[in-house]
Swiss-Prot record:
<dbReference type="InterPro" id="IPR016177">
    <property type="entry name" value="DNA-bd_dom_sf"/>
</dbReference>
<feature type="DNA-binding region" description="AP2/ERF 1">
    <location>
        <begin position="90"/>
        <end position="146"/>
    </location>
</feature>
<feature type="DNA-binding region" description="AP2/ERF 2">
    <location>
        <begin position="182"/>
        <end position="239"/>
    </location>
</feature>
<comment type="similarity">
    <text>Belongs to the AP2/ERF transcription factor family. AP2 subfamily.</text>
</comment>
<feature type="region of interest" description="Disordered">
    <location>
        <begin position="67"/>
        <end position="88"/>
    </location>
</feature>
<comment type="subunit">
    <text>May form homodimer.</text>
</comment>
<dbReference type="GO" id="GO:0005634">
    <property type="term" value="C:nucleus"/>
</dbReference>
<keyword id="KW-0677">Repeat</keyword>
<dbReference type="InterPro" id="IPR036955">
    <property type="entry name" value="AP2/ERF_dom_sf"/>
</dbReference>
<comment type="function">
    <text>Probable transcription factor. Involved in spikelet transition. Prevents lemma and palea elongation as well as grain growth.</text>
</comment>
<keyword id="KW-0238">DNA-binding</keyword>
<keyword id="KW-0805">Transcription regulation</keyword>
<keyword id="KW-0804">Transcription</keyword>
<feature type="compositionally biased region" description="Basic residues">
    <location>
        <begin position="76"/>
        <end position="85"/>
    </location>
</feature>
<dbReference type="GO" id="GO:0009909">
    <property type="term" value="P:regulation of flower development"/>
</dbReference>
<dbReference type="InterPro" id="IPR001471">
    <property type="entry name" value="AP2/ERF_dom"/>
</dbReference>
<dbReference type="Pfam" id="PF00847">
    <property type="entry name" value="AP2"/>
</dbReference>
Length: 438
């Protein structure tokens, strides 16, 4: 057996057996004559020098491992404040929607997400995002492709504002136009005309706008409906500057929620206290003061009625405030009874009723003469003393006012002398006159 050392960096061990010695090769006591042993075994104990490494050829396995490591190694990403990219797309600002089957592009501007349109491919959506990013944030914005690809687009986008350029990008998308027309919201009808309709309005699937002879007219009808619905944010077929009238009308409608005032103010006794104004389909509580002729009764000086608000000029003279729409709402039976007592209590009877009736039937100054400037129909009318149709008039007035007839009849009879007493007074007066003459 002999041992041999080779080189500085390695140790070589050589074993040699003489073929003449039979049975000398045994393993655990068993013969191993057919076992073939290697002549030299080499083991590396120290690293190789640069010169020795250059001589040793690289194995195939090592080359494959190096190539795979280089392929999977990614350059360090630049830290930005734009947020992570979408999981469904490798491009920035692009998202795939399975419901629509399109690639949609969005960009954030001033804390709001702006929709740029839907596209068939992710590359088209990414280019739309790049153009919007350059327009909103300048040439230093983070984009998906190189800046040299948008040299011509940069020259064109300088002529548009942000809103106008967003409209241009949206019109380039495939989701902008559906149907047989090149305009949004326009479809060729089977009758040969162009049908205009707008979708997703007021919770409905679409709203029919009509049939038009030309495609341009239908497109303009859609634009007007979109502006009326969404205002300046509407997606239109043509430039929104051509619809200035619709935009002004839309801004005017948004400012129509104004405070209304009735302005029912007169003298000291007729000053009306107007509460908070309300729309025409609601009722407003109006409190007014009664005139002097009605203050003689024991009723309260203030009455409260319900009337619809209406714009009317102030009354110059003192008196009860009676709005034109007041006759549509009948008062309660208690208020009617009190008003009948006021008219009937005039001292001598006839003169008091006549004065109250004249005051009541006097036209109200400052109101229109269209039939609403007179007193309400439930007020009492003047009656001649001794008239026989008083009960019939009371019944008719009670029936028209909507409250029980017995209350008006009772109030009138209690404050008015009967016909028998009137006839007895006349006979006694005539007898006294005859005696005096004699």
């Amino acid at each position: 057996m002999a041992a041999t050392f080779y080189g500085v960096g390695s140790i070589a061990l050589a074993m040699h057996e003489d073929d003449e010695e039979e049975g000398s090769g045994r393993v655990f006591g068993f013969a191993a004559g057919d076992l073939v042993r290697p002549a030299v075994v080499t083991q590396q104990l120290f690293p190789m020098t640069a010169a020795a490494a250059a001589v040793v050829p690289e194995s195939t396995e090592q080359r494959h491992v190096a190539a795979a490591a280089e392929q999977w190694a990614r350059p360090p990403s630049r830290k930005t404040r734009r947020g992570p990219r979408s999981r469904s797309s490798q491009y920035r600002g692009v998202t795939f929607y399975r419901r629509t089957g399109r690639w949609e592009s969005h960009i954030w501007d001033c804390g709001k997400q702006v929709y740029l349109g839907g596209f068939d491919t992710a590359q088209a959506a990414a280019r739309a995002y790049d153009q919007a990013a350059i327009k909103f944030r300048g040439v230093e914005a983070d984009i998906n492709f190189t800046l040299d690809d948008y040299k011509e687009d940069i020259k064109k986008m300088n002529n548009f504002s942000k809103e106008e350029f967003v409209q241009v990008l949206r019109r380039q998308g495939v989701g902008f136009v559906r149907g047989s027309s090149r305009f949004r919201g326009v479809t060729l009808h089977k009758c040969g005309k162009w049908e205009a309709r707008i979708g997703q309005l007021m919770g409905k699937k679409y709203v029919y706008l009509g049939l038009y002879d030309t495609e341009m007219e239908a497109a303009k009808a859609y634009d007007k409906a979109a502006i009326k619905c969404c205002g300046k944010e509407a997606v239109t077929n043509f430039d929104t500057q051509s619809y200035e009238d619709e935009l002004n009308l839309q801004s005017w409608d948004s400012e129509l929620d104004l405070e209304l005032s009735l302005g029912c103010s007169g003298g000291e006794r007729a000053a009306g206290e107007v509460l908070h104004s309300a729309p025409s389909n609601q009722r407003t509580s109006l409190t007014f003061m009664l005139p002097e002729e009605e203050e003689m009764t024991a009723c309260h000086r203030q009455r409260s009625i319900w009337a619809r608000p209406s714009l009317a000029p102030a009354m110059p003279d003192g008196g009860a405030v009676i709005c034109p729409d007041q006759h549509q709402h009948h008062p309660s039976s208690r208020n009617m009874l009190l008003m009948s007592q006021v008219i009937s209590s005039g001292g001598g009877g006839g003169s008091g009723r006549q004065g109250a009736a004249e005051l009541h039937m006097r036209p109200r100054h400052g109101w229109s003469s269209g039939g609403n400037n007179w007193a309400p129909p439930y007020a009492a009318r003047p009656r001649l003393p001794g008239a026989e149709d008083d009960d019939d008039d009371d019944s008719a007035a009670a029936a028209s006012s909507g409250f029980p007839m017995g209350q008006v009849a009772t109030a009138s009879s209690s404050s008015r002398p009967s016909s028998s007493s009137c006839s007895s007074r006349r006979s006694s007066t005539a007898a006294a006159t005859a005696t005096t003459g004699r």
